């Protein structure tokens, strides 16, 4: 069996989101064109400069706190000047980070309501939307820029924040099926959908009832997905997850010149059990995902997942080779000093992928 080509590149619902995406509206087309034009007008990084966010990421040049406070006045209570005279928030304060997220989602993504329950993972918006932008590039490989298409995506482990479905729908107009094992998390995402008309009819929620399964029980016979995406649990135990959260808080305090102090797991580095850890950690989760992906090879164009630990890539490559995957790609992403990567694989040849994508094109004048 030939080895895959491995490449490295710099209310729970019954709506048919996974069956076929609806055509994008003229408003979503105009929105993407305006967003792409705005990003393209910004200066590009020079050769040799440190890799940062994706060129189309609206957060590439940091946060405009004045504009954010105007858009979301509740943020004002958490903004303060830094020693250098710039405005910022205390990123170790969970309420500050949650309000920053709500402000970013309102200003840049037209989300009027976003909230998460106490103890839920509070995602960094710039890094999460980076993943979405790189998936757009992956889907339209060879094109100079992604086009507005009919795309169905599956978010594995959407959590209580539903962030990938929100960003993918608002930036690119993609349809989403978002799954999770926690019914409380899904109930919160449904609350977000119910309070944002722009998401209604575009995001379907499905509950995973088997803690040992990932795609099984979620992907239905009539489903067809262009992309799957996932931010897997990093840790192998609750203790490991708690230590990781506390370590991040201490490092943040040290970076600000503060004396580290004892603290519980902060919400912005927190998360509920299924969001942060599982038996076997990230390595085992990815192994299960890869094994199950073979069962749905004909229904999904690209399978993808974030990989936080570089040492977990090698066993993934080996498992994918055994399955006879056609193409494997690793996409590196960087935000500040944090480096993570997207592992992507497809059982379809390039010719089949081109034929698949040709069926998505919505003619435009």
From Swiss-Prot:
Record's subcellular location: Cytoplasm
HAMAP family named among the record's database cross-references: 23SrRNA_methyltr_F
Lineage, broadest ranks: Bacteria, Pseudomonadati, Pseudomonadota, Gammaproteobacteria, Alteromonadales
Superkingdom classification of source: Bacteria
Annotated keywords: Cytoplasm, Methyltransferase, rRNA processing, S-adenosyl-L-methionine, Transferase
Chain segments carrying region Disordered: 1-50
Reactions listed under catalytic activity: adenosine(1618) in 23S rRNA + S-adenosyl-L-methionine = N(6)-methyladenosine(1618) in 23S rRNA + S-adenosyl-L-homocysteine + H(+)
PANTHER family with a match to the protein in the record: RNA N6-ADENOSINE-METHYLTRANSFERASE METTL16, SAM-DEPENDENT METHYLTRANSFERASE
EC code(s) of this entry: 2.1.1.181
MF GO annotations: 23S rRNA (adenine(1618)-N(6))-methyltransferase activity
Protein name, entry field: Ribosomal RNA large subunit methyltransferase F
Signal peptide (UniProt feature, chain positions): none
Organism: Shewanella oneidensis (strain ATCC 700550 / JCM 31522 / CIP 106686 / LMG 19005 / NCIMB 14063 / MR-1)
Composition skew (Low complexity), residue ranges: 1-18, 30-42
InterPro entries: METTL16/RlmF, rRNA_lsu_MeTfrase_F, SAM-dependent_MTases_sf
GO biological process, one term: rRNA base methylation
Main location: cytoplasm
Pfam families attached to this UniProt entry: Methyltransf_10
Job description of the protein: Specifically methylates the adenine in position 1618 of 23S rRNA.
Family: Belongs to the methyltransferase superfamily. METTL16/RlmF family.
NCBIfam families: PRK11727.1
The keyword Hydrolase is annotated on this UniProt entry: no
GO cellular component, one term: cytoplasm
């Amino acid at each position: 069996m030939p080895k895959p080509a491995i490449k490295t590149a710099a209310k729970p619902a019954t709506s048919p989101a996974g069956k076929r995406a609806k055509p994008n509206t003229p408003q979503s087309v105009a929105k993407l064109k305006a967003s792409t034009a705005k990003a393209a007008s910004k200066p590009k990084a020079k050769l040799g400069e440190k890799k940062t966010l994706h060129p189309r990421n609206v957060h590439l040049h940091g946060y405009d706190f004045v504009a954010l406070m105007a858009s979301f006045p509740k943020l004002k209570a958490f903004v303060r000047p830094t020693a250098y005279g710039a405005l910022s928030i205390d990123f170790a304060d969970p309420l500050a980070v949650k309000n920053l997220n709500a402000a970013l989602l309102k200003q840049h993504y037209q989300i009027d309501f976003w909230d998460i329950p106490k103890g839920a993972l509070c995602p960094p918006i710039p890094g999460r939307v980076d993943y979405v932008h790189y998936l757009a590039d992956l889907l339209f490989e060879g094109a100079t820029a992604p086009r507005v298409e009919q795309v169905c995506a599956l978010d594995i482990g959407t959590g209580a924040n539903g962030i990938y479905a929100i960003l993918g729908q608002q930036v690119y107009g993609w349809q989403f099926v978002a799954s999770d094992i926690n019914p409380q998390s899904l109930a919160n995402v449904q609350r977000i959908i119910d309070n944002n008309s722009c998401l209604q009819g575009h995001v379907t929620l499905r509950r995973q009832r088997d803690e040992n399964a990932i795609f099984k029980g979620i992907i239905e016979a009539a489903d067809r997905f262009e992309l799957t995406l996932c931010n897997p649990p990093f840790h192998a135990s609750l203790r490991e997850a708690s230590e990781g959260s506390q370590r991040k808080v201490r490092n943040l305090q040290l970076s600000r010149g503060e004396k580290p102090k004892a603290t519980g797991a902060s919400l912005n580095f927190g998360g509920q059990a299924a969001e942060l850890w599982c038996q076997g950690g990230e390595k085992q989760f990815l192994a299960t995902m890869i094994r199950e992906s073979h069962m749905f090879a004909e229904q999904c164009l690209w399978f993808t997942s974030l990989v936080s630990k570089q040492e977990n890539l090698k066993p993934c490559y080996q498992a994918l080779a055994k399955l006879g995957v056609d193409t494997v790609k690793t996409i590196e992403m960087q935000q500040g000093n944090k480096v993570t990567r997207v592992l992507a694989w497809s059982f379809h040849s390039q010719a089949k992928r081109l034929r698949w994508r040709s069926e998505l094109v919505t003619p435009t004048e």
